[in-house]
Design a protein with these regions (language model features):
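A short alpha/beta connector and helix-capping loop motif
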Residues: 4-6, 22-48, 52-55
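Short hydrophobic beta-strand that contains or immediately precedes a catalytic carboxylate
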Residues: 9-11
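Short acidic, Gly/Ser-rich segments with clustered Asp/Glu that frequently serve as metal-coordination loops
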Residues: 14-20
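Short glycine/proline- and charge-enriched loop/turn segments
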Residues: 22-29, 73-81
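Serine/threonine-rich low-complexity intrinsically disordered regions
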Residues: 27, 33-36, 63, 75, ...
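Short beta-strand segments at enzyme active-site cores
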Residues: 53-60, 65, 162
Length: 201
């Protein structure tokens, strides 16, 4: 794989998901711990940075009144609103304190839905940099990761999804997504396998 044409796209590595005090952390706790997700994410980030890959964060944020969701949210967005999570400008919406950061990291703003391409400049940033391969990691495995994966697939990107650097609301949902859906729209790899591919070119 030609790493100069690849970017690491990180989904929602925010305190409300990854910090012990985060409002949505209890929902992800089992998968985060069982898969050693934060440690694997940081290894992935550091390795990608050493390869010269752009590191792109796509946090999700909402106004204090969650007006972006409309009058009657349902599904996962209703859960987010009920928890009071990811309010713009709060500690919970910030990139998690446990995540390796660098001033060169790119922040994609205005994501208030499931698909990181929808309503953001992600596609423009990737194409401006000549990116043809995206490496996906973060949260939630069967929601934002999978939705963004499908969009990237339709847009013609080569998509690699990192199986041990993602979490969601239970091992059953995690396994169903990674084992059955991810292979339809991406090339699933562990973070170590990804670097093995990169080393081989």
């Amino acid at each position: 794989m030609a790493t100069p044409k690849a970017a690491l796209v990180l989904m929602e590595l925010q305190n409300d998901f990854l910090a012990l005090e985060g409002k949505a952390y209890p929902l992800l706790k089992t998968v985060l711990e069982e898969n050693n997700v934060v440690s694997n994410l940081n290894a992935l980030i550091r390795g990608a940075r050493e390869l010269g890959m752009p590191i792109i964060h796509t946090p999700i944020e909402f106004s204090e009144d969650y007006r972006e969701m409309g009058a009657d949210p349902y599904g996962i967005l209703k859960i987010v609103k009920t928890l009071g999570a990811f309010q713009r400008g709060t500690w919970g919406a910030q990139i998690a304190d446990s995540i390796d950061r660098h001033p060169s990291d790119i922040m994609i703003e205005n994501k208030s839905g499931i698909d990181a391409f929808c309503g953001t400049r992600l596609d423009q940033v990737l194409r401006a940099k000549g990116i043809t391969t995206i490496v996906l990691a973060g949260q939630l495995t069967h929601l934002c990761i999978e939705s963004t994966m499908r969009s990237a697939y339709d847009k013609g990107y080569r998509v690699l999804s990192v199986t041990d650097a993602t979490a969601t609301i239970g091992m059953e949902q995690y396994r169903m997504s990674v084992e059955h859906n991810w292979p339809m729209f991406s090339l699933p790899v562990t973070h170590k396998a990804f670097f093995g591919q990169a080393a081989r070119g």
